[in-house]
């Protein structure tokens, strides 16, 4: 807490156990317009319909999620079981794997088309701001260099790609040993179980 517990105005603060970077567009901004009507509002107010517009942008986005496994389920006075910690992390991984959002009456799929990461001793977001896409091709050389710079990264990094999306899919599979995105999430969950069974 920022003040002693017995003093008024104290606020509980702690650094995040799960960190999410900003989602960064990997392509230049290209907008289009969607024309809408405000028919519902107009009918309720006995007004004329007006045309509204909203911007539409389609792009690949990159973001990084870092999870401090040591701190999951741990607070000042309580600590949940290892099984509960593993369950919480695996639920988060399931959420990311099937991520979507509902907006303006439609559902948008936000699940990953490409994923790279693993469980590492160093608590470092190794791949943050590293993934790039140019001409619908994932920048393999930089990712390969980072993975090969460390024995730990070589051994514990998993790469997944969704088939039929990127033009250099074969290159990604060969050079980064990529498999399906679903298999990567399966491996990550196995790593979570192994971590909590060993601690």
Residue spans for each PLM region:
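Basic polyanion-binding and macromolecular-assembly surfaces
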Residues: 1-199
């Amino acid at each position: 807490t920022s003040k002693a517990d017995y003093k008024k105005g104290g606020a509980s603060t702690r650094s995040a156990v799960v960190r999410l970077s900003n989602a960064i567009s990997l392509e230049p901004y290209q907008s289009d317009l969607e024309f809408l009507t405000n028919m519902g509002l107009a009918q309720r107010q006995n007004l004329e319909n007006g045309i509204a517009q909203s911007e539409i942008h389609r792009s690949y986005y990159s973001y990084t999620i870092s999870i401090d496994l040591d701190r999951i389920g741990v607070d000042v006075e309580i600590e949940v079981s290892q099984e509960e910690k593993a369950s919480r992390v695996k639920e988060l991984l399931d959420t990311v794997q099937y991520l979507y959002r509902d907006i303006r009456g439609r559902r948008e799929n936000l699940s990953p088309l490409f994923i790279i990461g693993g469980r590492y001793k160093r608590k470092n977001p190794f791949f943050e701001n590293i993934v790039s896409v140019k001409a619908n091709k994932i920048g393999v050389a930089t990712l390969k260099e980072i993975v090969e710079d460390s024995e730990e990264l070589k051994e514990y990094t998993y790469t997944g790609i969704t088939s039929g999306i990127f033009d250099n899919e074969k290159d990604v599979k060969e050079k980064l040993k990529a498999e399906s995105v679903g298999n990567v999430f399966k491996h990550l969950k196995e790593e979570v179980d192994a971590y909590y069974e060993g601690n």
